[in-house]
């Protein structure tokens, strides 16, 4: 039951390549350097009709046929195999995963800190507004009390001048001693 599978592709694309002999008539052979005549000699007009000039755009087909066939399935298999087995590839994936996790973690941490900061800003903003209202009320109360004290001071200084001056002197002595 232990089967060992081949690591080579199951289909060889070279099996399906059309041989060069099928392209040409029987009287002409192709070698790597170009066109040569076989035993059956033909005139130059016949050769020129089979192989058009460069300006006709078909010369490139002859040049392509001279190059070896490209095995795309082998190339694809080797590319995938190298990519999967390559240690650098797995290390880069691991580093990328760690970096992504770190960025995600820091992003969540920053979002939490921003939320806490916003809550504190809202809290202190509300306290400042209440403090502004309280301070304006205190200012009004202090102004009203200073007017009452000034009124009482005038009233006591006129109705009880002797007692008023004695108490004023005691207060002055107390502040000088301290």
UniProtKB/Swiss-Prot annotation:
Record carries keyword Nuclease: no
Principal subcellular localisation of the protein: other
Keyword Protein transport (UniProt): no
Biased composition (Acidic residues): 37-46
Any one GO biological process: regulation of protein localization
Keywords of the record: Coiled coil, Endosome, Transport
Residues forming coiled coils: 101-130
Region span, Disordered: 28-53
Cellular component aspect of the GO annotation: BLOC-1 complex; endosome
Compartments, record wording: Endosome
Superkingdom classification of source: Eukaryota
Stored InterPro entries: BLOC-1_subunit_KXD1 (IPR051390), KxDL_dom (IPR019371)
Function: Component of the biogenesis of lysosome-related organelles complex-1 (BLOC-1) involved in endosomal cargo sorting.
Family per similarity comment: Belongs to the KXD1 family.
Subunit structure: Component of the biogenesis of lysosome-related organelles complex-1 (BLOC-1).
PANTHER family associated with the record: BIOGENESIS OF LYSOSOME-RELATED ORGANELLES COMPLEX 1 SUBUNIT KXD1
Protein name per its UniProtKB record: Biogenesis of lysosome-related organelles complex 1 subunit KXD1
Natural source organism: Kluyveromyces lactis (strain ATCC 8585 / CBS 2359 / DSM 70799 / NBRC 1267 / NRRL Y-1140 / WM37)
Higher taxonomy: Eukaryota, Fungi, Dikarya, Ascomycota, Saccharomycotina
